[in-house]
Amino acid sequence: MSESAFSNRIVQSLLDTDFYKLTMMQAVLHNYPNVDVEWEFRCRNGEDLRPYLDEIRHQIELLCELSLSPEHLAFLERITFIKPDFLRFLGLFRFNTRYVKTSIENDELCIRLHGPWLHVILFEVPLLAIVSEVRNRHRYPDTLLSQARDRLYDKFEWLTTHATADELAELKVADFGTRRRFSYRVQEEMLGVLKNDFPGQFVGTSNVHLARQLDLKPLGTMAHEWIMAHQQLGPRLIDSQIAALDCWVREYRGLLGIALTDCITTDAFLNDFDLYFAKLFDGLRHDSGDPVKWAEKCISHYQKLGIDPMSKTLVFSDGLNLPKALDIFRALRGRINVSFGIGTNLTADIPGIAPMNMVLKMTACAGQAVAKISDEPGKTQCKDPNFVAYLRHVFKVPDLPSPEKPA
């Protein structure tokens, strides 16, 4: 009998989230425990999510029932950089509905978070997973696990046909697909298949719950929110990226060394990524713009600093699939180490089904606007256009034409 792609509970545990939310949460506990933040949900393609409001609220109530078991805490304790005080805090942590507001505004589903960063930070990934799975239950109720599994094996067949054995031996792929997964059961099934049958190197998952369950490595370092928040955390705006990186280094002392470059733009980031940081961090992560051009820029930066690029790693995570990953791998092979984090294309790619296109992003920190500009015009996000203009001015980022009106 074929198995349904859905289960009653969408979020399985407090660990059913991306690993970098926990690594950032620990840094927030130690450095910014009293800072307030605001987040807003946005459905990028205008899909009507209003009919799902009541069920989304019910799943949020279930989310707030979760706590970490002794087994969960024991798993985290084995991770060397998770500190005892953070483990004690997590043992007491519960999601609190006072910090999340759901409503219908202007005929759209509205989700807002407002509260202490320390207590709000873990909401993002499970909330997105809830919206995605509730919507999929209604739109595609008869979906079976076998459909997702067969699709993944088709991708493996393509990869083994188009890549050599030597290439496959070096091709490193990880799952980054929790937030927009079709369902929990689909992600769980996909990870089992990837662990056992992926023809290249399957190196782990960002999902901590499934890493524990399937004996995989949990992966992740920092997200845009870490750098965005520092725009309002005390230093001059021009020094905000440096402050974010410096705080990370003090927290992790050389561990978790993959830095995200495109919060403002990669050019602005590399201006701040001097020899000190370039030596301390293991590598960089790409999340917008042309991946090969970005990689060339990073390689050139390392070479100018006298650093061998082959001692560093570039992680790619922007809308990838296996053909794109293989193209990037071939363009950079032997010049710098590369790894690929694939999300929606692994956990929400089922024939005939359109995955969600949505984000839940930090909009304010300490009562003031924050922004992400990125290397791609369509990914710029801020509720205050004046702050975006000021950010561009301070970091000397030129205005770019919108994707709807190319120059």
Curated annotation (Swiss-Prot):
Pathway per the UniProt entry: Cofactor biosynthesis; NAD(+) biosynthesis; nicotinate D-ribonucleotide from nicotinate: step 1/1
Entries under InterPro entries matching the protein: N/Namide_PRibTrfase, NAPRTase_N, Nic_PRibTrfase, Nic_PRibTrfase-Fam, Nicotinate_pribotase-like_C
Domain of life: Bacteria
Any one Gene Ontology cellular component term annotated for this protein: cytosol
Residues bearing PTM Phosphohistidine: H224
Catalytic activity, reaction form: nicotinate + 5-phospho-alpha-D-ribose 1-diphosphate + ATP + H2O = nicotinate beta-D-ribonucleotide + ADP + phosphate + diphosphate
Any one Pfam family match given in the protein's UniProt record, by short name: NAPRTase
GO molecular function: nicotinate phosphoribosyltransferase activity
PTM field: Transiently phosphorylated on a His residue during the reaction cycle. Phosphorylation strongly increases the affinity for substrates and increases the rate of nicotinate D-ribonucleotide production. Dephosphorylation regenerates the low-affinity form of the enzyme, leading to product release.
Covalent S-S links between cysteines: none
Record keyword Transport present: no
Keywords associated with the record: Ligase, Phosphoprotein, Pyridine nucleotide biosynthesis
An annotated GO BP: NAD biosynthetic process via the salvage pathway
EC number(s) recorded for this UniProt protein: 6.3.4.21
HAMAP family registered for this protein in UniProt: NAPRTase (MF_00570)
Function: Catalyzes the synthesis of beta-nicotinate D-ribonucleotide from nicotinate and 5-phospho-D-ribose 1-phosphate at the expense of ATP.
Family under the similarity heading: Belongs to the NAPRTase family.
Protein name: Nicotinate phosphoribosyltransferase
UniProt organism field: Pseudomonas savastanoi pv. phaseolicola (strain 1448A / Race 6) (Pseudomonas syringae pv. phaseolicola (strain 1448A / Race 6))
Protein encoded by which gene: pncB
